[in-house]
């Protein structure tokens, strides 16, 4: 039977963008991937720094809802999320190991706040965050395999 991780809390809280672990992205260190993603919605460096200074990921998310989105946001948001999530796991080897330890489990960002783009609510959603995490996991597996091949 296929293993499914359908909630990013408790043992799997590290999968959440609200997990507070610093991530450097485009020259700025953010307290979480949520901070970085919300800041990526704008080009203005001062606005990005204000979002980076938000006290919590939730506050960063609220700030991100009030900014004027960059013109290409709808075209770039999925690739930006991939870039930020990949940076998180490249910069924190313990988190990369934890992600790899999920094996081939299907990762679903289950939620109750009706986010059907990045997750799934009541069985409905495209689960882009879960898909991106599985892409990052596959990338990390390939990188580990390549490193093993080089060192053997």
Per-region residue spans from a language model:
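Charged, low-complexity intrinsically disordered segments
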Residues: 1-152
């Amino acid at each position: 039977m296929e293993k499914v991780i359908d909630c990013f809390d408790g043992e799997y809280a590290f999968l959440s963008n609200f997990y507070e672990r610093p991530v450097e992205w485009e020259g700025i260190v953010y307290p979480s991937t949520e901070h970085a993603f919300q800041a990526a919605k704008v080009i203005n460096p001062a606005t990005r720094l204000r979002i980076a200074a938000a006290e919590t990921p939730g506050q960063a998310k609220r700030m991100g809802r009030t900014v004027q989105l960059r013109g290409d946001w709808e075209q770039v948001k999925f690739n930006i999320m991939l870039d930020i999530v990949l940076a998180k796991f490249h910069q924190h080897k313990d988190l990369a190991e934890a992600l790899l330890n999920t094996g081939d489990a299907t990762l679903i960002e289950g939620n109750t706040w009706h986010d059907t783009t990045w997750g799934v609510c009541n069985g409905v959603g495209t689960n882009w965050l879960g898909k991106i995490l599985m892409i990052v996991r596959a990338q990390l597996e390939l990188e580990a395999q390549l490193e093993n091949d080089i060192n053997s």
